[in-house]
Amino acid sequence: MADEKEQQGEQGYQLQSQHFYKIITSYMPESFEQDAVQIALIAVDKYRQLKDIAFYIKHEYDKKYPGSGKATEGVYHCIVGKSFASAVSHETRQFIHMKVDTYHVILWKSKDTPFTPGGE
């Protein structure tokens, strides 16, 4: 277990030296922020298509910080791109906007209200 964590730390250091990253805005605890950066660095290193990068970041962050399964608790969302505008609502201390190489990455958690067809 300790070897695995050390190996992940070494991989993170290598990726940080290979990729440029900058946190633009963050309303996350530092440990969550560091995990988001590490996951984003791995995604950019591993994938070329933006949809794959976004899916990987969301999927890995969901695995790292799983919810209880309640629909009203909230879920993570991720946007990756070079040029876009956004306006999102997020849970308190659950938002980060960073730049990795030439890509902007936004990761946030918001409550997911159960959908009722017809607005009932």
Curated annotation (Swiss-Prot):
GO cellular component: cytoplasm; dynein complex; microtubule; motile cilium
Keywords: Cell projection, Cilium, Cytoplasm, Cytoskeleton, Dynein, Flagellum, Microtubule, Motor protein
Gene Ontology biological process terms from the UniProt entry: microtubule-based process
InterPro entries cross-referenced by the UniProt entry: DLC_sf (IPR037177), Dynein_light_1/2_CS (IPR019763), Dynein_light_chain_typ-1/2 (IPR001372)
SMART domains: Dynein_light
Compartments reported by the entry: Cytoplasm, Cytoskeleton, Flagellum axoneme
Tagged with keyword Glycoprotein: no
PANTHER family per record: DYNEIN LIGHT CHAIN
Family designation: Belongs to the dynein light chain family.
Assembly and binders: Consists of at least 3 heavy chains (alpha, beta and gamma), 2 intermediate chains and 8 light chains.
Name of the protein described by the UniProt record: Dynein 11 kDa light chain, flagellar outer arm
